[in-house]
Amino acid sequence: MTLAAPIAVYVLAALAEIAGCFAFWAWLRLGKSPLWLVPGMVSLAVFAWLLTRVDADFAGRAYAAYGGIYVTASLGWLWLTEGQVPTRWDILGGGLCVLGAMVILAGPRAA
């Protein structure tokens, strides 16, 4: 089983979710126009659709594996979009989350 395909989908889903949530953040916390919500809601719908594209027997397992990728992508957003360099604790926590996601994705399953 190759992990490249689900990881790629999870990365795209994370970007879509973070962008969608940031649209709400921009509106409610940064005073941006409510028009930010239109692309934000589209982005959140794309996020939800992308998670259904992962080859997983159970939604909960797909979401759990996605969580590790989401945390790491959020730290990337923090750095690249918001200009805040992650701390060593952010990086350590993100790495642990990715490790957990890999265990969930690659772990053996009963037939």
Swiss-Prot record:
Entry keyword annotation includes Metal-binding: no
Pfam families: UPF0060
Bilayer disposition of the protein: Multi-pass membrane protein
Residues that span the membrane, as ranges: 7-27, 30-50, 62-82, 91-111
Major subcellular site: membrane
Keywords, in A-Z order: Cell inner membrane, Cell membrane, Membrane, Transmembrane, Transmembrane helix
Keyword Membrane: yes
Compartments (UniProt record): Cell inner membrane
InterPro entries named among the record's database cross-references: UPF0060
Recorded GO CC terms: plasma membrane
Stated family: Belongs to the UPF0060 family.
Protein's name according to its UniProt entry: UPF0060 membrane protein Pden_1837
